[in-house]
Amino acid sequence: VPVATAALGAVAGLPAGRLVASHFSVMSKATAQILTAGPAVVARAMGEQKTKEELGGWKVHTKNGTVDNGAADEAECLAEIRRFLSFMPDNIELLAPVIDCDDPVERTDEALLDIVPRDRRQAFDMHRIIQSVLDLTSFFEMGAGYGRSQITGLARLNGQTVGVWANNCKFLDGSMTADGAHKARRFMELCDTFSPPIISWVVE
């Protein structure tokens, strides 16, 4: 079954391990920290005075890939979990539900004709392409703060759940880094488990 976890306060030890092992994780920017050890232990062991936020706040863990997303508060964390689960089947024996699509089938986007510059050295907005091609407002990005040269997330195409993987030429020209490779591998494993097809956009 799909497992989604929210950190809503200070999380340490085994609960922290369960959180990072989830298929999707989110933490509250206002109240959450994920810690191996708290400030008192760090002060005794290392002689350094650090706050819980400095040791394990959202800025730390969305950047290092420990959690997928950060949300403003508890309510937004739970909203992110609901959205993630809306793309998922109940278990691996089932396919994700297909929802009614109210995106007009005749919709076109003239901006796509010239959104990719003729000058290959010039960056462009891959997010704009993704959002235009897929069902409107359906793209749910995962791990935006980590491995930023790669874009991963879930979306819908004609109501069907799809995985999205693209390289982002606004960061390191879309090149594959160690963090980007780890992020992409983890996302492909998620899609392999729950079977949504993957749509890939590649910038060379």
What does each model-identified segment do?
Residues 21, 26-27, 115-124, 155-157:
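Short low-complexity stretches enriched in small and charged residues
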Residues 121-204:
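Non-catalytic terminal/interface segments that mediate subunit docking, oligomerization
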Residues 31-33, 38-39, 43, 52, ...:
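Generic secondary-structure boundary/loop-capping signal
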Residues 73-130:
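Terminal amphipathic helices with adjacent charged low-complexity linkers/tails
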Residues 39-40, 46-47, 60, 117-121, ...:
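Short capping/connector residues at structural and topological boundaries
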Residues 1-93, 196, 204:
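Conserved catalytic cores of soluble enzyme domains
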